[in-house]
Amino acid sequence: MFKRVLLKLSGEFLSGPAPDGSAGFGISPDTTAQLARLITDALTGTNVELAIVIGGGNLWRGARNGKGMDAATADYIGMLGTVMNAMALQDAMEAAGQPTRVMTAIQMAAVAEPYIRRRAIRHLEKGRVVIFGGGNGAPFFTTDTTATLRALEIGADVVLMAKNKVDGVYDSDPRKNPDARRLDSLTHIEVVERRLEVMDATALTLCMDKGLPIVVFDLFQPGNLRRLLEGERVGTLIESERRPERLSHDPSSHVPR
């Protein structure tokens, strides 16, 4: 069983799907409440300390929304979006009975605590979920990199990369290859060499250099998060040394990465 974990969430988890099935926009109170209950229920009764980094793609994507804008400014807007998401998730999790703290890399004392590493660890030790917002305080870095950085700073055992309808990493795109197989175990260097889509290169390099494991899994498969927190193997595990590999070939689980 893990002692302390960092859960990386997509901002789109708060929006729900659009009518055409594509990723939605904004924050849906109902969808956010469902996500908060899912996380809270999985955590209840365990002794696992949980920190969360959430993206802001449901509110702002610099490459799309910031065309013609200074790149740093576009990134700062996106970082503010992650704070909005963090506050929405905090409200929903506390309504579900889970004490939380939002800590931001950009100081905004009226709405959240400034990020201080030792204080974040103390919150975790007291059983509070810590939600990190505002990226790492600097432009040109993704929330994947923020998740890796915060995980290393707080001494997390693993980064859990939560996905929706994606149950792990495949050896090829299952949307194009019906014989695609899910890889249960990989090393960091194999992810780099095979150009598998797990996280951005900066984040992956940090994990590889520091030996930080990554798990890619489907958050919305019932029971998955609880099983992970209890130490079971779920999804794809990426670590420094490869364990005996098991390949999954289940047509019902062929979902795109």
Swiss-Prot record:
Key words, A-Z: Allosteric enzyme, ATP-binding, Cytoplasm, Kinase, Nucleotide-binding, Pyrimidine biosynthesis, Transferase
Region span, Involved in allosteric activation by GTP: 21-26
Residues reported in the UniProt entry to bind ATP: K8, L9, S10, G11, G57, R61, N164, Y170, D173
Ways its activity is controlled: Allosterically activated by GTP. Inhibited by UTP.
One Pfam family recorded for the sequence: AA_kinase
Organism domain of life: Bacteria
Pathway: Pyrimidine metabolism; CTP biosynthesis via de novo pathway; UDP from UMP (UMPK route): step 1/1
The UniProt record lists the keyword Kinase: yes
Cellular component, GO annotation: cytoplasm
One annotated GO biological process: UDP biosynthetic process
Annotated signal sequence range: none
Catalytic activity: UMP + ATP = UDP + ADP
InterPro entries reported for this sequence: AceGlu_kinase-like_sf, Asp/Glu/Uridylate_kinase, Uridylate_kinase, Uridylate_kinase_bac
Binding site for UMP: G56, D75, N136, G137, A138, P139, F140, F141, T142, T143
CDD domains: AAK_UMPK-PyrH-Ec
Subunit text: Homohexamer.
Function: Catalyzes the reversible phosphorylation of UMP to UDP.
The protein's name in its UniProt record: Uridylate kinase
Organism in which the protein naturally occurs: Deinococcus geothermalis (strain DSM 11300 / CIP 105573 / AG-3a)
Highest classification ranks of the organism: Bacteria, Thermotogati, Deinococcota, Deinococci, Deinococcales
